[in-house]
């Protein structure tokens, strides 16, 4: 093995297989683009994003790690969210939870 070498498996890899998901429609009501990263607690995103926040509590974007989704001003789009895993304790972000979900 060479340091940093990748040895991918043959075939398709399904991200977040078997994890609970929800779909929400998000509108950017602000005048600036908003970008949300793959592991950001979606419930706590920028206030300019209008969507069902309670449905998003405990969820993040269902996208590959290290990627993001950008919402342009005035844009509306539907995104799939996946449940946060592990102990489901959230600290930081915008400070709206600061503990167990």
UniProtKB/Swiss-Prot annotation:
Signal sequence coordinates: none
Enzyme type, top EC level: hydrolase
Any single Gene Ontology cellular-component annotation: urease complex
Gene3D superfamilies assigned to the protein according to its UniProt record, in alphabetical order: Urease, beta subunit
A molecular function (GO) term: urease activity
GO biological process terms on file: urea catabolic process
EC number: 3.5.1.5
Keyword entries, A-Z: Cytoplasm, Hydrolase
A Pfam family matched in the record: Urease_beta
Pathway(s) the chain acts in: Nitrogen metabolism; urea degradation; CO(2) and NH(3) from urea (urease route): step 1/1
UniProt-listed HAMAP family: Urease_beta
Protein known as: Urease subunit beta
Organism: Cupriavidus metallidurans (strain ATCC 43123 / DSM 2839 / NBRC 102507 / CH34)
Lineage start: Bacteria, Pseudomonadati, Pseudomonadota, Betaproteobacteria, Burkholderiales
């Amino acid at each position: 093995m060479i340091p940093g070498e990748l040895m991918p498996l043959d075939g398709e890899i399904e991200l977040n297989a078997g994890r609970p998901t929800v779909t929400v429609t998000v509108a950017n009501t602000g005048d600036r683009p908003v970008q949300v990263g793959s592991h950001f607690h979606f419930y706590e995103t920028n206030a300019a994003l209008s969507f069902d926040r309670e449905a998003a509590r405990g969820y993040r974007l269902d996208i590959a790690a290290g990627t993001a989704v950008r919402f342009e001003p005035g844009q509306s789009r539907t995104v799939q969210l996946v449940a946060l895993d592990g102990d489901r304790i959230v600290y930081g972000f915008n400070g709206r939870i600061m503990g167990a979900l």
